[in-house]
């Protein structure tokens, strides 16, 4: 066994329990189990369950008996010696029992060892364990081997498992072998703690682990005690090895990942496959004498220190478990907290957990183990290092812990927890140092993996590492690089990354399949939220003093923090930094108190690193006070007291403005805490666990780990992935936390993975978080921050677990936390806060995170596709953005997501486009500033941020173009364009990066218009981006094609970016102001964006933006053309209108490019290749159908693209009418509300562009004019019906039928003049593209809402028509055509008008006002 141990260190390949089982069996068992453990937290959980079960007994024997000898023996044997003496000891025991563990240890040894504790807690853990184990036991050999190889492939699994923690819930089945793998994992990370800790501690942790698992959350089970320990023990009390698995698995994403990160890092650096079980560890043994040193120290320490560590550790562990448990399961968390506090005497909330705490505390060795852990960690392998970081130094660790207790907690509860309390401090400090040691591996892993994991860590790294390591902030985008600089961060990053990688590898399919967009988005958002929470939870606190107060108020604040940790997921990142604070925040998230923002703030701090560390410290204390924290309301005062302490990071409350400050602060914090990343990592798992454990809603995110991994990406995007942009552009901190604020459904899937831009869609969390949300709704404003963090994390989890189901009808309040973070976040929270530009402050983190997801989805596989689809995408962006517009965001979040597309796409869309506000918070805030103020500089900044994110995403070919035009171009137009472009990019990346960019691209393509429409285009882009975000979410969800699932999943970053500003009322109002102020520009601009691509395209997108005004339909139509090819692939099938939309989008004959793009798959690539192909197929089919329909009228519509362009200008009316129905199709998920929502948000925007355009054709809409859509071009034309009765066939987008309308013969003539007019307008001056359509689209929206005020005075029948008349009227022909189209479109709008009715309407139409049309559309669409 010793020989085996040597080989089977933690992830040994060989049979580490050769003595117990067959050598082959053992080998396979160890290989599978350890590989799995390394592979994912789910594994870790399984491992903890079985191995911990084994570990308790073996820990008792090995840890207690062998602890000294076995420490060296196990360490020597398994190569885990590098991990920790106790760890080695436990490992030896574990290795021996683990191999038999699947059979015996899994349920037996664990129970025997921890017989008393496991009963209540273990059972819970066991349930998940059983699930994991069930899969693992039977599949232990082969499956484990496969997992082992996966681990080999993603050695970061060590660190990844913690991030996988949420995935553990979701992927636990995936990692069916976690039991065995759990052993592996434990060996790397949990073993760090478990091996090192005496049997008693192990039993306690096992008990914690088991109970946590029992609930069916493999990871959360580990999390309550083990996860908490993992995050707390590995970081603070690494030697809390009692829950070796627990710490490792419970907070696998944070703490174990850190440990594993270190280990993986070292392993990777060695090039050995630690994941290859024995060989990896052997390799390490051979290659890393330093690890041996650690092992020796560990060995020495185990005898004397293991007990002490466990004494402290149980408390730390317990407190942390409380958080962790709270996260996965509040009950669990409570138990953990109670356990933690039982000794403290403050744990009176949870009697059951109090018992558990007793079990945990029964093993006083925790304190020693904790002390040992630091040394061992330092001296042992990187996976152990997390422990060292946790324990810092044996003696100093205790002292530090003691100090920390008074310092951080300052509560009597921690007299017992004092060692533990001090432990985190040294551990935090040490861990960062160690993090650097094993950071390389995580970093490598990060590079290895898709940037998904990187994002979150980058976020934390950027925020946290900058302090720890000045050089690594930008470069640390990968969580791994950061780890080098800041070990804590690196570990956290690695941890997040590893699970993310794992999820990418293993769950990407599941994610894509499950909730193609929503699941990945939510997943990404969860992760992102986690990362965000890490960096942002704390800072967000400044919005709510809770997080800071948590830190300062030892008992209450800590409790709150712990509870918070338990609740949302703030715990995940905050847990590391400020456990108590995080817990509180998490709890606050879960329990709407003022803690919600705390959670965000904490998360922010976590990301800042110091925040994470602070959270970790506080978490320890909070663990001690978890019970108290459970009564969330009670701790708020303390939270406020603690506020000052966290005030450092608290600053981040102003997400946008303070993002930079927070980022900077994060850096100091990082330096200050040094364990920030480590703690963050540790906390991350806890947070994940908290998410899983705390609220059922949050539990929805089965894979906060996966989302966490994605969150890593998201975080990176939010915090560090777009760290430069984030940190520099104020995205850093805000985005960091809020990146998942965008986590709405899809929305919250950042970019689908949304993470940043996808993040928005992470409403999937919404369902579960609904409870949380409802609770937090009361603190919706704080929730904006906290929810952004916690809910985002939740969303991440939900995204992983059920991005699509949850996202389904989350009431805005039900989603208040999740949906509020995703949908309500961007819908309600965004409505409330972003609208007020307050949420935008928090949302930036979300935004960035969401963007991060797009970064993760940076593999926008459709980037090439995006190029071809650029025009259609532009249109789609316009359409989608319009649809995703503020109205959609505001309204739809509540209604459409749940309703349409099973509420998934809608929720995704809604939240995506809501989160866009979050995601675009900087963008939104900047946009708001831009729209309210100059729309230029802020836009530019936002554009820069978004461009950076988008650039990172590199989603679209024209992202650079747009970036060039928007980012590179200095003119206001450029700024606007850039902003719009950024938004488009974000939106596009997440949902339709191309669509959003298309308008901007169009702008770029039409440089002549670039300048004049600069502001308008920016607005337009924003609107379009909004739309795109919104649509993107649905698109991301329904259609795999969207990278937005990444982007949208994270935030619907597209939504967040584009939709954020348009989406939020604040943005909306700003847009309205800007619309009116820059109406002309916007009008001009909008066409340049969409117009250049295709009159219908721009018109469609813009119109979609004003979908409420009729442009919605058109926008969708335009959108349907290309983006909707992707999206329509998703939505068109959903609704016949989708076809029309596609047709409309393709119809814009003026833009061959547009049509070309329309012919191609949506610009924003689906999340997966398969999804992309599917999207392409659907798009092609729909396009063909649409084209057939178009061709019906193409001859009619052949009037001229000039007319079309003019018609496009007028199209807004029609889009509202026609595409509006189609919009639901395209956005099958939330068509009606979204339309209205989009209309709401977009109308103001539309108004503005149309304000200028309206100047041109304002009066031309006589009663004789009708707005009709050309089926061929999909453009809307205003026709002067009375002029000449010429029967023309128009396609009614609403009804999907062709209507013969009498169009005046002079129709073409008027069309010509309007065309000239349109051409006169910058937006109309697009050679290849018909800017008019864009204008049309924008005006449509505008006409509906903006036009009403702007054009209501128009003599025309109503403001809408007036508005359209004003915009579309310039070309009489277009007017006539538009009038005709209005007839057609109008029919769909309201009761479909029969052709005669339409014809009659045309002459006596008096131009149905866009309002009327909007009403019709609303009726029809809604």
UniProtKB/Swiss-Prot annotation:
Function: Plays an important role in cardiomyocyte hypertrophy via activation of the calcineurin/NFAT signaling pathway.
Gene name per UniProt: CEFIP
Protein name per its UniProtKB record: Cardiac-enriched FHL2-interacting protein
Keyword Cytoplasm: yes
Ranges where the record places region Disordered: 1-23, 151-177, 199-265, 279-443, 459-500, 516-718, 731-850, 877-1127, 1142-1244, 1353-1422
Assembly and binders: Interacts with FHL2.
Comp. bias regions, Polar residues: 201-210, 342-351, 461-470, 907-926, 944-954, 1048-1067, 1353-1366
Coiled coil spans: none
Keywords, alphabetical: Cytoplasm, Phosphoprotein
Compositionally biased intervals (Basic and acidic residues): 284-298, 305-315, 395-405, 481-495, 524-537, 579-588, 611-622, 635-644, 653-675, 790-801, 828-839, 975-991, 1185-1202
Biased composition (Pro residues): 1087-1099
